[in-house]
Amino acid sequence: MKRQCMNRVALIGTGFVGASYAFALMNQGIADELVLIDVNKEKAEGDVMDLNHGKVFAPKPMNIWHGDYQDCQDADLVVICAGANQKPGETRLDLVDKNMNIFKTIVDSVMRSGFDGIFLVATNPVDILTYATWKFSGLPKERVIGSGTILDTARFRFLLSEYFQVAPTNVHAYIIGEHGDTELPVWSHAEIGSVPIEQILSQNDRYRKEDLENIFVNVRDAAYQVIEKKGATYYGIAMGLVRITRAILHNENAILTVSAYLDGQYNEQNVYIGVPAIINRNGIREVMELKLNETEQQQFHHSATVLKDILSRYFDDVK
């Protein structure tokens, strides 16, 4: 009966990102139950106490407790934020060796509980580890989702909104590809309202292509800048994870840029990578295939190739 009327989220990893996600989830009143699981039990217990002390101010009551992997059995969604953090000077791909073994242990432990829900992966390198989660879990590909380029897309829309002086909600633009150094902007589908940005540039001398190129560079390198200043990024990605959570638990059929499995879309195979996808209670309903121009298609293929080159070191069927 609980599975029919209650939404349970199991959060694995209560570091900066995990704790921020738990806080944002409680504040938005999306889930009914939240169980925190961490190798550092004292930290998880402290977070539970802290969150529960603020529950009276939340929009709706949420049952929050510290648990273990067996609590994943009745979870609708398992969110993985555990793993080694990116340090100054490191790329996200530098974290692969550190986190692959951690993920094997985590996913095996979750599946032993009898879990039959959806995985949402946030740990970097997210595209690689989402693929690993799919392989380790044996779940259908649509029920394993990575945060992908949801934060990059949000950063992109924010900076474009600042440049064009419009609300971010009126900016429609995507960052796709690896959540990392090979990601790319889809300028051919970027719009302010319903007006293509390329059209705005051609009609108004106030806006310059060079400025837009700098905006993308700032999007791509934003994590490095934040890490250099404060040691880690966590608020933005936590909000993105909650947005994906809402789309899943509320069956929204929302289009979000997540790390999704490609099986021929964008002319790519056997890779998880950031693309727009329709998200609902069943996970990824379908991948939205944008018609890329030739340059974008080449950049996207390069991004997928970089990811597959790394995956091939760990999985024999990736070529």
UniProtKB/Swiss-Prot annotation:
PROSITE patterns: L_LDH (PS00064). It comes from Geobacillus sp. (strain WCH70). It is found in: Cytoplasm. CDD domains: HicDH_like. Belongs to the LDH/MDH superfamily. LDH family. Beta-D-fructose 1,6-bisphosphate binds at R157, H172. InterPro entries: L-lactate/malate_DH, L-lactate_DH, L-lactate_DH_AS, Lactate/malate_DH_C, Lactate/malate_DH_N, Lactate_DH/Glyco_Ohase_4_C, NAD(P)-bd_dom_sf. Its main location: cytoplasm. GO terms for molecular function: L-lactate dehydrogenase activity. The active site is at H179 (proton acceptor). Keywords: Allosteric enzyme, Cytoplasm, NAD, Oxidoreductase, Phosphoprotein. NAD(+) binds at V17, D38, K43, Y69, G83, A84, T105, A122, T123, N124, S147. Its EC number is 1.1.1.27. This is L-lactate dehydrogenase. SUPFAM superfamilies: LDH C-terminal domain-like (SSF56327), NAD(P)-binding Rossmann-fold domains (SSF51735). It catalyses: (S)-lactate + NAD(+) = pyruvate + NADH + H(+). The gene is ldh. Homotetramer. GO terms for cellular component: cytoplasm. Allosterically activated by fructose 1,6-bisphosphate (FBP). It holds the Pfam family Ldh_1_C. The keyword NAD applies. Substrate binds at Q86, R92, N124, P125, V126, D127, D152, T153, A154, R155, T233. Catalyzes the conversion of lactate to pyruvate.
